[in-house]
Amino acid sequence: MCVDCVEKEYPNRGNICLESGSFLLNFTGCAVCNKRDFMLITNKSLKEEDGEEIVTYDHLCKNCHHVIARHEYTFSIMDEFQEYTMLCLLCGKAEDTISILPDDPRQMTLLF
């Protein structure tokens, strides 16, 4: 992973969890070949462990194949919620939780 290729290391992305793709706005250019171009996604893998899906892949410079960052995305179901996380030097860090029920219990108002 190369901190010289990104504007900000692990930017906070709130609840935007990417299973694929690249956050190009954070890419300043390849520190090896000095070009700012699209990236390749390589070594993509999907593993399932204990009900959790883990997607990992590498962001590579399209021109010189320099490894810019390693991307990790996870998905799991906990009780009545889907939980997503993302951790990547380039794309950032993020978490999101979404209810699988028609009405989100966190959004219910108390009727007293």
Swiss-Prot record:
UniProt entry tagged with the keyword Transcription regulation: yes
Residues engaged in binding Zn(2+) 2: 30, 33, 61, 64
Keywords linked to the UniProt accession: Activator, Developmental protein, Metal-binding, Transcription, Transcription regulation, Zinc
Residues the entry annotates as binding Zn(2+) 1: 2, 5, 30, 66
A GO term, aspect molecular function: zinc ion binding
Record keyword Glycoprotein present: no
GO BP: any one term: fibroblast growth factor receptor signaling pathway
Positions contributing to Zn(2+) 3 binding: 59, 71, 88, 91
Pfam families from the UniProt entry: Churchill (PF06573)
Origin superkingdom: Eukaryota
Segments traversing the membrane: none
InterPro entries, per database record: Churchill_sf (IPR038543), Transcrpt_activator_Churchill (IPR009508)
Family from the record: Belongs to the Churchill family.
Function, in words: Transcriptional activator that mediates FGF signaling during neural development. Plays a role in the regulation of cell movement. Does not bind DNA by itself.
PANTHER family according to UniProt: PROTEIN CHURCHILL (PTHR31931:SF2)
Protein's recorded name: Protein Churchill
Record organism: Bos taurus (Bovine)
Lineage: Eukaryota, Metazoa, Chordata, Craniata, Vertebrata
